[in-house]
A protein has these predicted regions:
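Gly/Ala-rich beta-loop-alpha elbow adjacent to hydrolase catalytic centers
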Residues: 94, 98, 102
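Catalytic active-site module of serine/aspartate enzymes centered on a nucleophile-bearing elbow/loop
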Residues: 226-269
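Conserved HGGG/HGGXW glycine-rich cap/lid loop of the alpha/beta-hydrolase fold
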Residues: 9-64
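Conserved alpha/beta-hydrolase catalytic His-Asp/Glu region
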Residues: 126-128, 132, 140-195
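Flexible "cap/lid" loop of the alpha/beta hydrolase fold
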Residues: 103-108, 113-143
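Active-site loop/oxyanion-hole signature of alpha/beta-hydrolase fold enzymes
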Residues: 40-43, 47, 53-94, 248
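Acidic catalytic loop of the alpha/beta-hydrolase fold
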Residues: 207-211
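Short beta-strand/loop motif that positions the catalytic acidic residue
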Residues: 196, 202-204
Length: 269
């Protein structure tokens, strides 16, 4: 795996890249995570023939925070990464806030994507009916609860204390200093979703406190080419809690988005 940096004005973003000639998959971490939280996905996706790239957004482990007066957008930074690595088109796989960045990118640059996988996410939809639903799911005091309670399902916390400890260690290391809130480039509305002509996989855990299955079904009503998978015994971090089921669902979806050699590199990696 190659460790590198994307140069941006006033900062650098850290990435890991397996290299190879396979169709690229770019992994976008949760709002509390970093590229390190994909340790259960990078190997299996690469073994299935993909070039796998994970990166840390601004202020997350390995990446600079950058100037506060020029925060840019998460989707703009993803475009810079894709251009830097010579990716003409790629699969985007985002979890939680990473899926919001992926969706924002898809709305701005649909021609750069082969597919979109949106996992365990509130998706940043700004419609009043959806915002009211979100508020019902997260009552006052929710954000004061321990991180592992909010982000990991009860089945995983009961069955895998060592996995919880590993997750907590990576989470604690993920944001070493100040945090930066980057705006989105697009208003993520129902109309915007309806206009998106891309294959989309919606994945969530059956015990996700942020985005339970009915939320996923609501998104699917507005995405013309959406598929849905619910991961059993998983919370808001399904990729970490149930990686075998998560990876199987993702690989099945990716496999059906065209076959043959990948011809989308702008330049050699």
């Amino acid at each position: 795996v190659i460790e590198g940096f994307v140069p941006l004005p006033g900062l650098r973003l850290a990435y890991s890249d397996t290299g190879g000639a396979g169709t690229p998959v770019v992994l976008l971490h949760a709002g509390t995570g970093s590229k390190d939280l994909w340790e259960h996905q990078i190997g299996p996706l690469h073994a299935a023939g993909h070039r796998v790239i994970a990166y840390s957004r601004r202020g997350h482990r390995g990446s600079d925070l950058g100037p506060a007066e020029a925060p840019g957008t998460g989707s703009g930074d993803l475009l810079a990464l894709a251009d830097h690595l010579g990716l003409a088109r790629f699969h985007a796989l985002g979890t939680a806030a990473g899926a919001i960045v992926a969706m924002d990118f898809a709305l701005s640059h649909p021609d750069r994507l082969i597919s979109l996988t949106l996992a365990c996410t509130i998706l940043g939809v700004v419609e009043p009916d959806y915002l009211a639903l979100s508020q019902r799911l997260r009552p006052p005091g929710f954000m004061a609860m321990p991180a592992d309670f909010r982000e990991l399902g009860p089945a995983y916390r009961a069955a895998n204390p060592s996995g919880v400890a590993r997750w907590l260690a990576l989470e604690h290391a993920a944001i070493p200093g100040a945090q930066l809130r980057q705006p989105v480039a697009n208003a993520i509305t129902w109309a915007a979703l309806r206009g998106l002509d891309l294959p989309c996989l919606l994945l969530t855990g059956d015990a996700d406190l942020w985005a339970p299955p009915p939320v996923q079904r609501l998104f699917a009503q507005h995405l013309p080419r959406a598929e849905q998978v619910v991961i059993a015994e998983a919370g808001h971090s399904a990729h970490w809690e149930q990686p075998e089921a998560f990876n199987a669902a993702v690989l099945d979806f990716l496999r059906r988005q065209g076959s043959g050699p990948y011809e989308g590199h702008k330049t050699s990696p």
